[in-house]
């Protein structure tokens, strides 16, 4: 036993090959504790470097027959290399026959935005690491023409205590920059731009929450310039504001992905409205000068706040109730081209909590947007 201990504590010998005989465990993710077994590692952690998948690992301890380290992040390829530096001599390097199977962990981290030390924040354009923060963000939507641009609708009227505003922001994922798409003034002076949807590549609808049913519930905008290129950072690409439909207390807007009709709601009595595609097209074309007609397909009850998310096939939609804490489904009747009376698929009305479960036994607390996953790698 004493001889084994002496052997384990032996210093690195540059005249003897460095060998890796095994790794334990053989699979794991970022931060996994990893033991590399072998010969002639020495006893000095300061001269030993380990790379997993080409990424440098943190070496915790070294003995002549083993190295204890932590798996680095993004070590996808899994090759394990041990390097030993010995003064002015060439670096000794060896690669293990076995590969480490790197398992990606599901992590949530900050993309952009930060608060000041006093807890408040600034609302400003800037790179992801210096863009202030977002006042009451409500809805995210990708630009169909420029998929590296993500729009963020903000409901400044929701009571945020900080310095945010109701401007619609843009996340430029390619250039890692936050810009402004529409100001409160661009949206008719409202600071409650609740959601947005695209009629087509060059026409956008914005749901606004205001209290006069004779004013716009949904505004339409036309793209009047292309996305910025190079070092340019002007994201004001939308103009020619038009009232697509009038009503009050609108929380959401969406378009049927096949038939193209527009759907929006009202918090007032929980109405679920339909507007025909042809009328929206005429407004954008300039052949109709008044807001579109609307039809109530069904309604919930007083003070029902919700978002609508239609499945890409158009076969059905989810109604995500924000203030009633549950999710309904409404199927699409292709013959009549309208959504029918909804039914509950998850949660129970006015029972806010966080509980995993099936159907009405599940619980939500202020659910919001939701998304349908098209890429099977993310399903």
Model region roles, listed by residue range:
Residues 2-112, 149-151, 169, 227:
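Ser/Thr/Pro-rich low-complexity tracts
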Residues 27, 58-60, 196-197, 253, ...:
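Short, exposed beta-strand/loop patches in secreted or surface proteins that constitute
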Residues 36, 104-138, 164, 174-194, ...:
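Gly/Pro-rich loop segments of beta-rich domains
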Residues 57, 65, 78, 119, ...:
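Glycine-centered loop/turn positions within well-structured domains
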Residues 85, 142-144, 171-173, 221-223, ...:
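Inter-blade boundary loops/turns of WD-repeat beta-propellers
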Residues 142-144, 149-161, 198-199, 205-213, ...:
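Conserved beta-strand positions in repeat-built beta-propeller and related beta-rich domains
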Residues 153-176:
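Beta-propeller domains
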Residues 160-168, 212-221, 269-276, 325-330:
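Structural motif
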């Amino acid at each position: 036993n004493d001889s084994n201990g002496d052997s384990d504590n032996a210093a690195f010998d540059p005249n003897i090959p460095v060998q890796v005989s095994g790794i334990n465990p053989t699979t794991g993710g970022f931060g996994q504790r990893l033991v590399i077994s072998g010969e002639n590692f020495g006893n000095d952690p300061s001269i030993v470097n380990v790379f997993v998948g080409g990424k440098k690992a943190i070496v915790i301890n070294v003995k002549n027959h083993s190295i204890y380290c932590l798996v680095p992040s993004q070590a996808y390829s899994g090759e394990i290399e041990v390097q030993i530096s010995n003064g002015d001599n060439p670096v000794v390097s060896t690669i293990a026959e076995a590969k480490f199977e790197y398992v990606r962990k599901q992590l949530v981290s900050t993309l952009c935005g930060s608060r000041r030390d006093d807890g408040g924040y600034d609302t400003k354009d800037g790179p992801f690491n210096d863009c202030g923060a977002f006042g009451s963000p409500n809805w995210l939507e990708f630009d169909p023409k420029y998929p590296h641009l993500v729009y963020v609708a903000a409901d400044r009227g929701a009571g945020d205590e900080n310095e945010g505003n109701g401007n619609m922001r843009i996340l430029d994922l390619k250039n890692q920059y936050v810009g402004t798409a529409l100001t409160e003034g661009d949206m008719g002076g409202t600071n409650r731009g609740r959601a947005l949807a695209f009629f087509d590549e060059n026409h956008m609808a914005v749901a606004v929450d205001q209290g006069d049913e004779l004013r716009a519930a949904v505004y339409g905008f036309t793209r009047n310039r292309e996305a910025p290129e190079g070092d340019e950072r002007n994201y004001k690409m939308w103009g020619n504001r038009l009232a697509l439909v009038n009503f009050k207390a609108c929380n959401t807007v969406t378009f049927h992905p096949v038939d193209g009709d527009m759907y929006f709601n009202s918090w007032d009595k929980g109405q679920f409205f339909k507007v025909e595609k042809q009328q929206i097209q005429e407004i954008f074309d300039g052949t109709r000068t008044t807001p579109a007609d609307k039809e109530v397909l069904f309604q919930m009850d007083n003070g029902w706040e919700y978002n609508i998310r239609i499945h890409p096939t158009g076969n059905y939609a989810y109604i995500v109730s924000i203030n009633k804490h549950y999710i309904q489904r409404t199927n699409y009747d292709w013959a009549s081209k309208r959504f029918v009376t909804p039914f509950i698929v998850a949660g129970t009305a006015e029972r806010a909590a966080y509980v995993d479960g099936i159907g009405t036994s599940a619980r939500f607390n202020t659910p919001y947007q939701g998304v349908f996953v098209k890429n099977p790698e993310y399903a």
